[in-house]
Amino acid sequence: METIMAQNEILGKVAFATQYSHIKKDGKRETYIDAMTRVKQMHQEKFPNLWTQIEAIFQGFVFPGVVFPSQRSTQFGGIAIKRNNMRMYNCTASYVDRVRFFAEGFWLLMSGCGVGFSVQKHHVDKLPNLITKDQRDNRLNLVHVIEDSIEGWAEAIHVLTKSYLPSNEDEAKHCISFHYDQVRPEGASISIGGVAPGPKVLEVAIEKVRFILDQAVNQGQSRLKPIQCFDMFMHISHAALLSSRRAATIALFSPDDEEMMTAKTGTWWQDNPQRAYANISAQILLDGFENKSVFTDIIANARQYGEPGFFFCYDREFSTNPCGEIGLYPTFKDDQGNVSSGWAVCNLNEIVVAKVRDADHLLQACKAAAFLGTLQASYTNTGYLGETTKKIIERDALLGVSMTGIMSNPNMIFDEMTLKQCSKAVHDKNVEIAKLININPALR
């Protein structure tokens, strides 16, 4: 056991150095304490009235490695999160029910977030109609200059997709050409760390998305199919991956969608290698009318090809993050009853069980993790995503506290009374801190 723990600690240090540690002004990499200090100072600047409490949490639990803030806050804590609050969150979820999904999803991937998304038929059916072949072949050319930012890259995707899926006549008038000269060259440094991938990565994604759209138009389709939406976003995800960003994604689909059900069968890795960038799962409604044959088909495919998976729900509007451990509800209903879709987020902290001394120490670690998670939930400047997403995040203010290395002390972790006490401690601390910083307590 001690050997395994030592090996895990070494792997953890490697992961930290390669994925989370920044290069300092003196050219050296941050130590773990440096990185956590960066996160601590970010919270203290935002909440000066909680300066002492934040200091105590970091000194007592974070610096010793008992509690970890969200992975993304470790990676981007400081200026990067101040500029783009969505970098605080590990994962997100939404639906392909609006043209802006493709651009927003790209922006989130480039921000470091994982993306769960639904291509269920009832969501994809909400997209506008495709332009006709005659409309496409008789358009005026329009040059779009791509700005050198993640917003600029995302907007390029939006300009392209809305020209094929227009919501008005003006959007259908132009064939879009792209000007890439403002995009910094491959290898140039970027402000959040690392180097730029260069314009070719984006150009390839744009042209592959255009190919799918042109193919749909050439086939006389009036609407996109879920499999086409899936493939479009996978080409976009590949661009994020080649830009040294996360491309963690999961696609949820209708269980009667045969094309999605068989998306990873046959020689898909040769014909459609982009599909490797997402897990796919059928979303099965538990309403008492479940179709056993559909579930049998899923299992048969999974035994042969490893996918698809299945995602049980009581509401088809529920979604999940790529890890599949949390339900997310990315819609908002206003006072007039109008429903709009946006993005819901996963807000997760971690307790390292191997560093926990006893049940009382675990209880205190849970309170510390809940304290940090509640602070994290207050970062709701959603920027490119707009007001609907801001309202969803502020309404839910979700909080997750997970435990890693549970088998290092199973007697403590699997004790029912201890777990109930920990759950109550997380809830109570969340309510306390949410009131202090004037946000909603976690919806769940």
At which residue positions do the language-model features occur?
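Extended catalytic cores of very large enzyme megasubunits
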Residues: 1-444
